[in-house]
Each structure stands twice: as structure tokens, then as C-alpha cells.
């Protein structure tokens, strides 16, 4: 189970504080090459760690904006994960665009997700998407965020709503059969009507998966500076809660399963890789600022991709983490993991409910789950 961080963006979104660098057109080839060399070297050093997590054979390429990279570099990085070297050219069936899993590499990934932006898909076209499929990509996560052009401009997104529509069509026509759409809610100027229209259209596309996140103000983001200057005020919690209910109601009516606080899927299309994070499965994170987890040790890279630090969790810290992550999901946590008195009180007042031999937060309380979880750890 591997996460690969691609730290490049064409521009920075208003709300984002993830580590990334501006990739300037015409001057990005050298930056991409240096990054690929460093990542391949890191993967080579960490082959034993990668092998130790292979019982769940998933790969997630996130960022940043992975879709700015050419497929040739992705192919080299994939080779460093699976063979330690550059693989041979893919067979003719893959070069022709036939969808395969993992191409010439020794083991197909059960799930291979790549994050893309709509404008890259439209600009690079169907041949680019088919190259991704030839590499083994079998799931695409696209950052739509909104279908309102005014909201997109405020976010400093490079695409307009029409690009998202085009990009989704290109992905489908190219043969992508597992698409996840990212949305954002909880923006002051996002009205109920605008959000309802975005939801209506996205659900009409029938993606296999939807992730929706409440806007948060992160310390290193441009949004934090806007707040400091008095140029933006957070949306009231009542507005955010109402939009979360809109999400839940619309997606439920459309047949999606609400399996994690911010994630919905058509039955059987839940994200395997991300679900493993919430169940605390070991994983290796490669690239600048990537995080890893194995044998009770959480570690993280510096911005240059080299190890920056680690911490070993105590038994009590593991229990608390299991509760915090598990209660974000519809599966919940095993009965007995939460202090008995706290669990009894939460069951009595409706903050928890039983689901077989497990305890979970009822869906209608998920919006306030942070407060509930804080009381239970």
C-alpha cells in the first residue's frame, strides 16, 4: 500500500496548504526530472518497507496535481516501486488504448488511483487518459470542487465548470470505469441553490464515488491571509450543517452509500486505499512531505523527500487513534475499545448506536462527530 506525492501545481488554490511547487509551462521539465530521480531513489531505498505493506496492493498518486506529469515519468516511478528499474515498453494492446491493469508490471494493483484536474484532462485529451490506463490506473479522482464559475474563481481554480463537464466525458469515453469527484462546501458565498445545482449535475453524471469536504482555514493558505486581513469571514456553522444535510440527502436519494464522514460511493465502489487508512493499515508514503505508518511507527518526509521525523505510538495512543479514525466511518469501532462508562452514556443520549458487535456515530450526528469523538477518547 503506497502513497506517492506529486508536489507540483500550475497555481495555488485559495484554501490549500499542502506542500507543492509551481510548475511553470516551458520550464517544468527539469523540475519534473529531478523529482522523478529523487522519488525513484527513495523507492529503491525503501523496497523492504514497500514489500511489507503489499498484502494490500494499492497505489494512490496524489498531490499537488499529478496530472501535470507526463506519463513517461509516471512509468519510471512505477517501475521503481515494482521492479527497481525501467520496465520494457508496454505490449501493443496497451499502446492501442485497451484498458488493462498495471500493464507490463509484475503485479496488477488492486486499486490504482491518480488525482487529476479537469483542465489537464481536456488539454491533454483522450490519448493521455488511455496512457494512464495502460500504466494500470483503474480509478481517477477529479478535483471538480464546484460547478459555479464564480465559486471556482474565488478558489483560484484554473478550470471553469464547462471544463469539468468535458473532462468527465473524456474520462468515460476513454474507458475509465471508476471515477471519484471531489466537491467543497461550507463557503460563505455558496448558497443553497448554487450547491443544489452542483449536486444535481454531478449526480446526473453518475460517478462511482463522491468526496465532499467542508472548507477549512489552514494556517499556511492564502485563505488564512484573507481572514487575517478581514477580507473573508467563515460561513456560519448553521450554513455548513445545512449544506452537509443537502449532501447526505441528495446522495442517499441517488443510491450512494455514506461510508465515511466525507465519502459516498455506489455499492461496492468504496475507496479501498483510503478505507485502509481509516482502519490503520500499514502504508508507505513516498515523495516530499509524505507520511508513512508501519509497526506502530508514524514517520514523515521533509520537503526534499528525505526522512524528517517519526514517532512510536503507545498502546493507549493506538487505542485513541483507532477510535478517532473508526468513528469517522459507518463501520465504527469494536465494542470494548471505548471506555465502558463513556460508551454507555453516549449510547443513552444517541451519540452512539450499536451495529452488531460494533459502535458507531449515527449518520445524523456525523456533522458534529469531532465533538463526539473528543468526548470518547
Which role does the model predict for each range below?
Residues 337-348:
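Short amphipathic alpha-helical interaction segments
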Residues 7-18:
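Local cysteine-cluster metal-coordination motifs and their immediate loop/turn environment
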Residues 348-357:
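A short, conserved structural fragment
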Amino acid at each position: 500500500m503506497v502513497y506517492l506525492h506529486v508536489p507540483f501545481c500550475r497555481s495555488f488554490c485559495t484554501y490549500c496548504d499542502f506542500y507543492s511547487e509551481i510548475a511553470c509551462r516551458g520550464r517544468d521539465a527539469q523540475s519534473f526530472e529531478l523529482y522523478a530521480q529523487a522519488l525513484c531513489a527513495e523507492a529503491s531505498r525503501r523496497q523492504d518497507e514497500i514489500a511489507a505493506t503489499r498484502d494490500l496492493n494499492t497505489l494512490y498518486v496524489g498531490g499537488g496535481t499529478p496530472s501535470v506529469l507526463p506519463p513517461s515519468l509516471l512509468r519510471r516511478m512505477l517501475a521503481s516501486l515494482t521492479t527497481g528499474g525501467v520496465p520494457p515498453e508496454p505490449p501493443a494492446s496497451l499502446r492501442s488504448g485497451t484498458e488493462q491493469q498495471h500493464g507490463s508490471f509484475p503485479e496488477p494493483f488492486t486499486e490504482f488511483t491518480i488525482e487529476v484536474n479537469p483542465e489537464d484532462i481536456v488539454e491533454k485529451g483522450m490519448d493521455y487518459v488511455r496512457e494512464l490506463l495502460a500504466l494500470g490506473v483503474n480509478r481517477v479522482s477529479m478535483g471538480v470542487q464546484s460547478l459555479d464559475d464564480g465559486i471556482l474563481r474565488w478558489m483560484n481554480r484554473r478550470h471553469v465548470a464547462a471544463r469539468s463537464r468535458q473532462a468527465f466525458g473524456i474520462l468515460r469515453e476513454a474507458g475509465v470505469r471508476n471515477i471519484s469527484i471531489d466537491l467543497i462546501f461550507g463557503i460563505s458565498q455558496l448558497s443553497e441553490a448554487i450547491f443544489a445545482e452542483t449536486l444535481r449535475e454531478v449526480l446526473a453524471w453518475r460517478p462511482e464515488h463522491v468526496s465532499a469536504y467542508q472548507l477549512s482555514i489552514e494556517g499556511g493558505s492564502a485563505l488564512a491571509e484573507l481572514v487575517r486581513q478581514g477580507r473573508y469571514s467563515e460561513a456560519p456553522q448553521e450554513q455548513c450543517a445545512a449544506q452537509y444535510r443537502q449532501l447526505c440527502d441528495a446522495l442517499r436519494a441517488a443510491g450512494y452509500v455514506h461510508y465515511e464522514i466525507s465519502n459516498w460511493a455506489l455499492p461496492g465502489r468504496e475507496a479501498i486505499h483510503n478505507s485502509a487508512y481509516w482502519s490503520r493499515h500499514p502504508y508507505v508514503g513516498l515523495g516530499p512531505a509524505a507520511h508513512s505508518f508501519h509497526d506502530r511507527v508514524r514517520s514523515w518526509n521533509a520537503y526534499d523527500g528525505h526522512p524528517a521525523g517519526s514517532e512510536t505510538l503507545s498502546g493507549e495512543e493506538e487505542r485513541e487513534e483507532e477510535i478517532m479514525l473508526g468513528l469517522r466511518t459507518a463501520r465504527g469501532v469494536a465494542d470494548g475499545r471505548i471506555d465502558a462508562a463513556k460508551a454507555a452514556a453516549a449510547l443513552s443520549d444517541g451519540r452512539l448506536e450499536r451495529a452488531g458487535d460494533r459502535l458507531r456515530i449515527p449518520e445524523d450526528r456525523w456533522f458534529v462527530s469531532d465533538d463526539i469523538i473528543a468526548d470518547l477518547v
